[in-house]
């Protein structure tokens, strides 16, 4: 009997040990914040039954093309806008400016700008502006392969009709405009927050509400602690109930704004400044508090991607009507080829958003509704001039311009494939400003990177929540035992000592890994030395023997060598 009890006890102990030491599987469980995205069948509302996995699979192919366009193209690299001299159209009593150095934007110094950029000179120019970008051309090298000098026409603006615009586009002839390199001013955490930014986001989201209805939603409560801060549940429930009563057009309008907001917050949390060590990097807690803990925000990010994908798709067949660098065949062809590759890839992918479902009712009503939609989004773009942070204002203006351009393409441009049987495609010429094209591609790139950043945060979450190793559990037990047998007064000292030892361990491990990497490299070179020695001195392809033979032949008479009879 005692033997049987002992065996049962051993079996129970063995089971417990296996559960502790052999625990495996995904650390992202069904109850985690990622559960809604883990299900590949989760459909994103107001799309053509597109799922999270559909968008991620497409983005895995699109992302490298967007990176190549935005990082290695002069055309997409520079953006000209009125960043400092445009007054806010709205009365904000708490109008403030960000005092952090992270808010600053690097631009060309005004005193270094040539005379042709002065207001007098700019006022004399029409159409293309041949001298406007000379300063950048002369002072900055091209980032494109096989190109040494930036073509001025890659930086020029072409004047266009103001009709059918969904956002306010800065006039590049304005002497207050400046060129900004987007590579030198990445979108990342600046520290800009507080009542002022909350007030601006409140005014932006209030554009979702029809003019005839009272704003029953307390948007300041939704965003009390800065961009996308955790809202109270009653307010969030009220917003959901209100959205259920909205029309499709109102829901799309809100989802675009929320998706843009989620993308911005994702970038800020991924490029977050660690105040302890001064290193920029992902901050999972920031992302959880601003986006991940609220599934509708993550869903709206993916919805905005689907909408932007459809806008890029509609460029198919219109590229011939667009000019990029008119005085440089090489740069124009490179930019055109890259954009054509992106558009072609998206065009051959499943359609994710159907713009024809919007404004599809009675023509008189739908026209008025579209005009109201357009004016509300133009108000959103105008609110970007009220942002107190320069870098936030820069990327806010770019992305509202990008989404405004996408909406313009979706709702104002004919679909060539639907009309090709009745009209020649050239009759549907698409006219876009240079700033609109640059904003459109860079905004799509922002969304694409946000999707990638979501996966990065998921990997970090999985790493933090994976089962602890046996060594870590043993060390944790030792630490608990040590704390239990020492006086409470010594606990702060022990905690600080423990943190120092952990830092020392990781620093030592990093240095040791570097030493071992160097050792393996040197040791491998020694192992390859005999083969290298044989190749250099004794092989038929030996560069040493060939060099020696070549030089010896120069001093030996040619007739000394016997002639080889031809076969």
Curated annotation (Swiss-Prot):
One of its GO biological process terms is: protein folding in endoplasmic reticulum
Localization, UniProt: Endoplasmic reticulum membrane
Membrane-topology descriptor: Peripheral membrane protein
Q: Which domain of life does this protein belong to? A: Eukaryota
Give the signal peptide as a residue range, or say none if absent.
1-22
Any one GO MF annotation of this record: thiol oxidase activity
Residues binding FAD? 188, 190, 201, 258, 261, 290
Pfam families annotated for this entry?
ERO1
Q: What class of enzyme is it?
A: oxidoreductase
PTM per UniProt? Answer: N-glycosylated.
Q: Name one GO cellular component term.
A: endoplasmic reticulum membrane
Give EC number(s), comma-separated. Answer: 1.8.4.-
UniProt KW keywords: Disulfide bond, Electron transport, Endoplasmic reticulum, FAD, Flavoprotein, Glycoprotein, Membrane, Oxidoreductase, Redox-active center, Signal, Transport
> Which pairs are disulfide-linked?
88-386, 98-103, 154-325, 389-392
Glycosylated residues: list them.
49, 546
The UniProt entry, under InterPro entries, shows: Ero1, ERO1-like_sf
Q: Can you tell me which residues form the catalytic site?
A: 389, 392
Q: How does it assemble?
A: May function both as a monomer and a homodimer.
Family statement: Belongs to the EROs family.
The protein, known as: ERO1-like protein 2
Taxonomic path: Eukaryota, Fungi, Dikarya, Ascomycota, Taphrinomycotina
């Amino acid at each position: 009997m005692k033997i049987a009890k002992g065996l049962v006890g051993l079996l129970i102990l063995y089971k417990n040990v296996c559960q502790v030491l052999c625990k495996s599987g995904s650390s992202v469980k069904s109850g985690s914040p990622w559960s809604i995205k883990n299900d590949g069948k989760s459909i994103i509302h107001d799309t053509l039954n597109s799922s999270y996995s559909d968008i991620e699979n497409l983005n895995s192919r699109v992302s490298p093309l967007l990176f190549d366009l935005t990082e290695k193209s002069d055309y997409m690299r520079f953006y000209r806008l009125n960043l400092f001299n445009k007054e806010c159209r709205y009365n904000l009593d708490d109008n403030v400016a960000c005092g952090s150095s992270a808010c600053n934007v690097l631009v060309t110094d005004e005193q270094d700008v040539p005379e042709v950029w002065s207001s007098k000179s700019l006022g004399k120019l029409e159409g293309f502006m041949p001298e406007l970008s000379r300063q950048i051309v002369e002072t900055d090298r091209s980032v494109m392969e096989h190109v040494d000098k930036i073509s001025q026409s890659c930086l020029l603006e072409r004047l266009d009709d103001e009709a059918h615009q969904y956002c306010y586009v800065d006039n590049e002839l304005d002497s207050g405009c400046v060129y900004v390199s987007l590579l030198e001013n990445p979108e990342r955490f600046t520290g800009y927050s507080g009542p002022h930014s909350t007030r601006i986001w409140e005014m932006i989201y209030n554009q979702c509400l029809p003019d005839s209805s009272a704003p029953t939603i307390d948007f300041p409560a939704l965003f009390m602690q800065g961009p996308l801060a955790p809202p109270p549940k009653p307010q969030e429930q009220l917003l959901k109930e209100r959205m259920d009563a909205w029309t499709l057009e109102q829901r799309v309008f809100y989802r675009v704004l929320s998706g843009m907001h989620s993308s911005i917050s994702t970038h800020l949390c991924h490029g977050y400044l660690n105040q302890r060590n001064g290193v920029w990097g992902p901050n999972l807690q920031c992302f959880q508090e601003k986006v991940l803990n609220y599934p509708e925000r993550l869903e709206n990010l993916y919805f905005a991607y689907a909408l932007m994908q459809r806008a890029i798709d509609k460029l198919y067949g219109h590229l011939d009507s667009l000019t990029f660098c008119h005085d440089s065949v090489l740069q124009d062809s490179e930019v055109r080829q890259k954009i054509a590759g992106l558009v072609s890839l998206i065009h051959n992918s499943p359609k994710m958003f159907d713009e024809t479902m919007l404004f599809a009712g009675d023509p008189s009503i739908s026209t008025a509704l579209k005009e109201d939609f357009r004016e509300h989004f133009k108000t959103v773009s105008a609110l970007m001039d009220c942002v107190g942070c320069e870098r936030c204002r820069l990327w806010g203006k770019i992305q509202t311009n990008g989404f405004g351009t996408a909406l313009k393409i979706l709702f104002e441009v004919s679909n060539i494939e639907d009309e090709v049987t009745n009209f020649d495609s050239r009759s549907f010429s698409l006219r876009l400003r240079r700033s609109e094209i640059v904003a459109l591609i860079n905004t799509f790139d922002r969304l694409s990177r946000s999707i990638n950043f979501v996966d990065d945060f998921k990997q970090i979450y999985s790493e933090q929540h994976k089962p602890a190793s046996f060594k870590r559990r043993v060390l944790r037990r030792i630490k608990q035992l040590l704390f239990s047998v020492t006086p409470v007064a010594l606990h702060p000292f022990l905690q600080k000592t423990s943190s120092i030892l952990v830092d020392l361990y990781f620093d030592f491990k990093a240095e040791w890994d570097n030493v071992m990497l160097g050792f393996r490299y040197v040791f491998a070179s020694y192992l390859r030395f005999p083969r290298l020695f044989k190749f250099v001195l004794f092989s038929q392809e030996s560069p040493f023997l060939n060099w020696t033979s070549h030089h010896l032949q120069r001093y030996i008479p040619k007739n000394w060598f016997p002639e080889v009879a031809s076969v």
